[in-house]
Amino acid sequence: MKEFSALTRLGRARRLRALACRALEERGLGQCSLAFLPDDTNTLFRARLPNGEGFVVRIGVHGPTAHSPSEAAAEAAWLAALASSGLAVPEPVPDREGRLVSVYGAPGVESERVVVVFRWLPGRPLADRLGP
């Protein structure tokens, strides 16, 4: 099997897809379809239920810039609190045990990764609205 670090961005996403599927299964969302969303830092997948409801699965990077599980949990708890107050923020989706953050490994992936699932927030990218 080719080393993870030698793979293209798409090749790495293919291997990390198993982590996204596991995170969705553990949240009762296993029937979602997945689409890779290119990003410069984390690996992101957009997930959609047959009824159109959307989610984002964020798989953290590996290495010195990676967030620890406790850092990701603090971020997720903060976003959950903001969402519960009525602010339009990406709301983390807990797993069946109530955890907002998961840590998974997979064959062919160099280390365990921190994974968080968020509800899809409709809108346009801010960059589309910025300009001179």
Feature annotation, model-predicted:
Residues 10-13, 41-45, 106-113:
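Short, functional N-terminal and low-complexity linear motifs
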Residues 48-132:
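ATP-binding pocket architecture of kinase catalytic cores
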Residues 1-32:
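Juxta-kinase regulatory segment immediately upstream of eukaryotic protein kinase catalytic domains
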Residues 27-50:
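ATP-binding glycine-rich phosphate-binding loop
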Residues 16-20, 40-43, 75:
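Short N-terminal amphipathic alpha-helix/helix-capping patch enriched in small hydrophobics
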Residues 13-17, 47-52:
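Short hydrophobic/aromatic-rich motifs at helix boundaries and adjacent loops
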